[in-house]
Amino acid sequence: MQFLYRSLLLALAVVSLTSCGTYTELIGTWTKPEYMNKGYKKVLVFAVGTKSLVNQSVAERAVAIRIAKTGTVAVPASDVFPLATYDANKDGKIDDPTIADKLAAKLKVDGYEAVLIFGVKDIKEQQRYVPGTVTYQPTSYYNGWSNYWATTYQTVETPGYYTTDVEAYVEANMFDVQTSDLVWSAQTEILNPGSLSDAADSFAGTIVPSIINNGLVSTK
């Protein structure tokens, strides 16, 4: 997954030159029936698969801010579990094999009720051709048929060009801290992310309403 995040950053550099705006589509969601309207009051937001604390923080904060607007306490994992605590050399491998159990225990002690984990699952780049256009502009010359014929239409031509579309597939899962049950899951497609910040904001604006609509966070 670390490779996917590096690929996404490279793709962002390409698409930012031609992007018309970031768009996130919610491909599918699932909610465990018995957890609907659970109304979690404290949630940890965890972005996985990135070696950069900055990138992790940007993604987590975008989602946490959206959730916090409902009245739920939403905390970025990078504030609680810095990358250095489990992958000090940033090699994509967990240093302490018991860290998962330690994190789970700490979440319970600190009063977290749910943890939302998300990460990039796949990235695709597609090149497409945008056809040129020809616009005809009528003129107002009526000085005889020849002049009219010669200048009846002026044309404005825009040449065609190639552009690259970037599609990033991001999966999000919410777990109950006490039972470890998967309570909600979503698959999304982010189209042409102009920047990491744009992608994070677009992603957050798409998944958080689904979480709210299923009653998984408390509301004011």
Language-model features, listed with the residues they occupy:
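Bacterial N-terminal signal peptides that target proteins for export
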Residues: 1-8
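C-terminal motif of bacterial Sec signal peptides marking the signal peptidase cleavage site
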Residues: 16-19
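C-terminal/domain-edge helix-coil "capping" segments
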Residues: 21-41, 50, 129, 146-220
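N-terminal segment of the mature soluble domain
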Residues: 42, 50-125
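Surface-exposed short loop/turn segments
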Residues: 95-174
